[in-house]
Curated annotation (Swiss-Prot):
Keyword set includes RNA-binding: yes
Protein name per Swiss-Prot or TrEMBL: Protein TAB2 homolog, chloroplastic
Pfam families: Tab2-like_C, Tab2-like_N
Species whose genome carries this gene: Arabidopsis thaliana (Mouse-ear cress)
Family matches, as InterPro entries: Tab2-like, Tab2-like_C, Tab2-like_N
Keyword RNA-binding listed: yes
Annotated function: Nuclear genome-encoded A/U-rich RNA-binding protein involved in the biogenesis of photosystem I (PSI) and II (PSII). Required for the light-controlled accumulation of PSI and PSII during early plant development. Does not seem to be required for the translation of mRNAs of the PSI subunits.
Length: 374
């Protein structure tokens, strides 16, 4: 997994080396090809408080007061970008967990953090540890919609398996679909930013405190039969082609998922080759449809075990494919994984009818990000 130094401006990513020619792998892969198709915004902005409509004409005294409030790590946040369309925010990312901060009773403070993928919506609220339940969460979600004038979301993504019962129950009572997923990238980045600029400055901060609810990394299971392809290959695309592929993603693909590269601050040369995995099958459309419901997170080449690991949801890992370990195949797997790390974790999964085709039935742009420090 790549280690990224994130800031609110950009993540710097070095150039990606060329990947050696891929080899064939098994179950039920029989052949291999290099996928060579050439056809295959917002910058991160975190705010510390909501701005009143009269902010354009505030006095110097008010400016000083606002700066003090913005600098206060104990303050809460309720923000909606005034230029955004509130009705268009249909999916939220949510974390409800303890923080490395003690209250006056010496107990860990809990915090609700909510945003959307574009960070147009940003909300934080602290809670004592004796009110943590689905009712508290449900009421907090409703309060967000009332305070900011946004509708209830259709989906809420969350990444902590330990909170699944509470979050799912709260969402069910509000007719919201709870989606367990590590594709909460905006939330991941925001939590990292809050740790660096808010939590560590809080008067109750406990240095060295470990997360109460850590992320799961379970042993990989066998892949369900309906997710098998017939062939696969390590592949690579120029960064320019990746950007083109996701430029009008919703129009091109029924199946798949994109990333906001501007939000992530990815900076690489347009000719840099981004590693990926191409899977071909005569059942491309059904396979892509099945994959579409899995919240695909990442793919890992495990050269020590001679297999590829597919991570989906929040705590599910599959042995996606296996291969015969030889010096050549080991070098190829290690080169692919190294290239992925060098690109800041950026990689992709393409599902096709044929490995020689220039078209994809499904396309998932993926990235490895370290888990948040809280």
């Amino acid at each position: 997994m790549a280690t990224l130094g994130f800031n609110t401006r950009r993540i710097q990513t070095p150039s990606l080396p060329r990947i050696p020619k891929p080899s064939s792998f098994t179950k039920p892969i029989k052949t291999h090809h290099l996928f060579s198709s050439e056809t295959l915004l917002k910058r991160c902005r975190f705010v510390s408080r909501s701005l009143p409509e009269s902010s354009l004409s505030i006095t110097k005294e008010q400016e000083v007061a606002n700066e003090v409030e913005e600098d206060d790590p104990t303050s809460e946040l309720s923000y909606l970008d005034p230029e955004s369309d509130a009705d268009s925010i249909k999916e939220w990312e949510l974390d409800f967990c303890s923080r490395p901060i003690l209250d006056s009773r010496g107990k860990k403070i809990w915090e609700l953090v909510v945003c959307d993928a574009s960070l147009s919506l940003q909300v934080t609220k602290y809670f004592p540890n004796n009110v943590i339940n689905s009712i508290t969460l449900k009421d907090a979600i409703v309060t967000i919609t009332q305070d900011l004038g946004v509708p209830l979301p259709e989906k809420i993504r969350f990444f902590r398996s330990q909170m699944q019962t509470i979050i799912t129950k709260a969402c069910k009572e509000l007719a919201i679909k709870a989606v367990p997923s590590k594709r909460c990238l905006s939330l991941f980045l925001w939590l990292q930013e809050r740790y660096d600029t808010v939590y560590t400055r809080h008067p109750g901060f406990q240095k060295g405190s470990l997360p109460l609810l850590s992320l799961d990394n379970p042993f990989p299971m066998n892949l369900p039969e309906n997710l098998f392809g017939e062939k696969w290959a390590f592949v690579q695309l120029p960064y320019s082609a990746v950007r083109e592929e996701i430029s009008d993603f919703d129009e091109k693909f029924v199946f798949g998922a994109s990333l906001d590269l501007d939000l992530l601050g990815i900076e690489v040369d347009e000719n840099t080759l981004i590693p990926g995995l191409s899977v071909a099958t005569s059942r491309a459309k059904p396979l892509a449809a099945w994959m579409n419901g899995l919240e695909v997170c990442s793919i890992e080449a495990d050269s020590s075990k001679g297999c590829l690991i597919l991570s989906v949801g929040i705590a599910t890992r599959y042995v996606y494919a296996t291969y015969k370990k030889t010096p050549v195949t080991t070098d190829e797997a290690e080169a692919w994984e190294s290239a992925k790390k060098t690109s800041g974790g950026l990689h992709f999964l393409a599902i096709q009818d044929d490995l020689d085709s220039d078209d994809c039935v499904g396309f998932w742009l993926l990235i490895d990000l370290p888990p948040p420090p809280v």
